[in-house]
């Protein structure tokens, strides 16, 4: 496990919520509850610098989280945050249930089939209505792999490897 000072990508500001400066957050772990206990978050500025904000309140809103930051009380003050990535210190985040991962722990993994064939590197994750989709880049092509329990057989964080069982015909697409 990494040090507690490591920053972890936890989500993205998808929209404002109401007129009092609240933000609608799309979590990147699939676990809405993991964001409800945060007392501070970091927002990455366009230049890459992190800005820290104290969280006044948070609540679940379906598959999203509504966060109120102490520094803001008006929608106009938070409009510049829409679309920005959110980070937290790993030490502030709860341990996820088995077989759930924070995005930062998956991005960069080498993806291989159960037969040992290298498919490439996991470079992005697409959030869909039902299950996430892993974007794997390798051998000059992009492969979209559904993030399903019967497809993702193993994630070995130490070896930085994900083993998958591809659905019939997926590589033919």
Curated annotation (Swiss-Prot):
Identification of the protein by name: Ribosome maturation factor RimM
Single GO MF annotation: ribosome binding
Organism (species): Geotalea uraniireducens (strain Rf4)
InterPro entries registered for this protein in UniProt: PRC_barrel-like_sf (IPR011033), PRC_RimM (IPR056792), RimM (IPR011961), RimM_N (IPR002676), RimM_N_sf (IPR036976), Transl_B-barrel_sf (IPR009000)
Any matching Pfam family: RimM
Subunit structure: Binds ribosomal protein uS19.
PRC barrel domain residues: 98-170
Biological role stated in the UniProt entry: An accessory protein needed during the final step in the assembly of 30S ribosomal subunit, possibly for assembly of the head region. Essential for efficient processing of 16S rRNA. May be needed both before and after RbfA during the maturation of 16S rRNA. It has affinity for free ribosomal 30S subunits but not for 70S ribosomes.
Stored PANTHER family: RIBOSOME MATURATION FACTOR RIMM
Family: Belongs to the RimM family.
Classification via NCBIfam families: 16S_RimM
Domain of life: Bacteria
GO annotations of cellular component type: cytoplasm; ribosome
Domain text: The PRC barrel domain binds ribosomal protein uS19.
Compartments it resides in: Cytoplasm
UniProtKB keywords: Chaperone, Cytoplasm, Ribosome biogenesis, rRNA processing
HAMAP family, alphabetized: Ribosome_mat_RimM (MF_00014)
One example of a Gene Ontology biological process annotation: ribosomal small subunit biogenesis
């Amino acid at each position: 496990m990494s040090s507690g000072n490591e920053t972890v990508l936890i989500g993205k500001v998808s929209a404002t919520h109401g007129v009092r400066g609240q933000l609608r957050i799309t979590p990147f772990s699939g676990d809405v509850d993991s964001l409800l206990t945060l007392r501070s978050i970091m927002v990455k500025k366009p230049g890459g610098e992190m800005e820290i904000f104290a969280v006044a309140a948070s609540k679940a809103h379906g598959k999203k989280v509504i966060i109120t930051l102490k520094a803001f009380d008006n929608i106009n003050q938070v409009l510049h945050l829409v679309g920005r990535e959110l980070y937290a210190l790993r030490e502030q985040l709860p341990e996820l249930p088995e077989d759930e991962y924070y995005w930062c722990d998956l991005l960069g993994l080498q993806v291989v089939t159960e037969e040992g064939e290298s498919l490439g590197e996991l470079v992005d994750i697409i959030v869909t209505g039902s299950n996430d989709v892993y974007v794997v880049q390798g051998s000059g092509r992009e492969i979209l792999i559904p993030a399903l329990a019967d497809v993702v057989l193993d994630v070995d964080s130490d070896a930085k490897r994900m083993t998958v069982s591809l659905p019939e015909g997926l590589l033919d697409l």
